[in-house]
Design a protein with these regions (language model features):
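Acidic, low-complexity terminal tails and accessory targeting/binding regions
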Residues: 1, 69, 73-77, 83-97, ...
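Active-site-proximal alpha-helix that buttresses catalytic centers in soluble enzyme cores
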Residues: 2-77, 101-110
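Generic beta-sheet signal
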Residues: 4, 50, 129-140
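Histidine-centered active-site/metal-ligand motif
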Residues: 9, 138, 184-186
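Short, active-site-adjacent cap segments at secondary-structure transitions
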Residues: 13, 59-61, 84-85, 141-143
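Conserved anionic group-binding/transfer micro-motifs
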Residues: 29-33, 116-120, 135
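Short beta->alpha linker loops
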Residues: 55-59, 137-140, 160-163
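Internal catalytic-core helix/loop-beta-alpha segment
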Residues: 101-130
Length: 189
């Protein structure tokens, strides 16, 4: 058995619909990144991450960097733990509405270019391929991994807060949910 910590990125400098499609962290988010690194480093040695993996997006990479620096490792980038793919025909302005609708339903009800149930499995496989890692990701991808681990169908099964840490054990190649991370008190969209 191996433990995997999946962390939502820190607070970004901008949100959906703003001018920057790939924002980094704001000052609060940068402090959150340092704090979550310290919290992970304070875990017992048998639970402490030894590898750092991130979504390709800047807010995740910047959240991951303090832990990688402290561990003396490079951040491994894996698009499988990235944001939920938006339908190709959807404009950036329409994405928040599409996500709000998706959050109200199940994975198989999401309208788009791909099979989103299969996408949840791809996210889970991505996470599971990094035993002993801290995986920095996104709200929807965290929900995808939790759904895959629990067999859940609801898209927004929980509302992970910025830098909340969701814990999985890896048993025979499968993710087993140990603990969901702290939930947000504010809306994502």
């Amino acid at each position: 058995m191996s433990r995997i910590h999946m962390i939502r990125h820190g607070r970004p400098a901008s949100t959906w619909g703003d001018a920057d499609p790939d924002p980094g962290l704001d000052a609060v988010g940068s402090e959150q990144a340092r704090a979550v690194a310290q919290a992970l480093l304070a875990l017992p040695p048998s639970e402490r991450p030894t590898r750092v993996v991130s979504s390709p997006l800047r807010r995740c990479r910047e959240t991951a960097q303090p832990l990688a620096d402290a561990l003396g490792v490079a951040v491994q980038i894996d698009p499988r733990v990235g944001e939920i793919p938006t339908p190709a025909a959807l404009s950036a302005e329409a994405r928040p509405g599409w996500l709000r609708l998706a959050f109200q339903g199940t994975w198989n009800e999401i309208q788009g270019d791909l099979d989103y149930v299969a996408w949840t499995r791809e996210v889970a496989q991505g996470v599971a391929s990094y035993p002993g890692a801290a995986v920095f990701s996104h709200f929807v991808a965290l929900n995808a991994a939790v759904s895959a681990a629990t067999g859940g169908e609801v898209v927004a099964a929980f509302r992970p807060d910025h830098v909340s840490v969701t814990v999985f054990d890896l048993v025979d190649g499968d993710l087993i949910l140990v603990e969901k991370g702290r939930e947000a008190s504010t809306q994502v969209l």
